[in-house]
């Protein structure tokens, strides 16, 4: 639940309830999570129908639930590309895949097999600038962005849809790193480590996706 800068861990389980451990060494291995809408700062209403690509993948593959029927995807990472194909095969209409960068974040074969083979358009250097709908998504507006990442006026395009999937990368789970006082890399948001994967605090190490 918490780690102090003196390496005192506050934890909890069903058997013992809440307890503390004074550690000599700690390994941070909390992993990462998908970027949410909040992390992307997309303006507009907050209706139902906005999912991370990983959540949508779980709903379809494991729970047999279709998130929606008319879909716009933001981000062209491999999970987003694969979900574009999967949603299409399940009967949904994927209107467009918008990618902020001037290149796709996914493998070339996934672009061909998941988008080109199903005539799904990929718009590079584009992002979602507005979400419409109160109870449920009714549409999104995308626009081209310049080299500074800002939307270019006059390039707006509106797509009616009931679902927006976000495939915009992963960010480290850094709350415990932050509470421990570990120095974070401003680029990756993960801990800064040396060659031994030791953080700025002696005896506190980090590994895996919590780093980047």
Which residue stretches match the model-derived regions?
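Residues forming the flavin
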Residues: 1-212
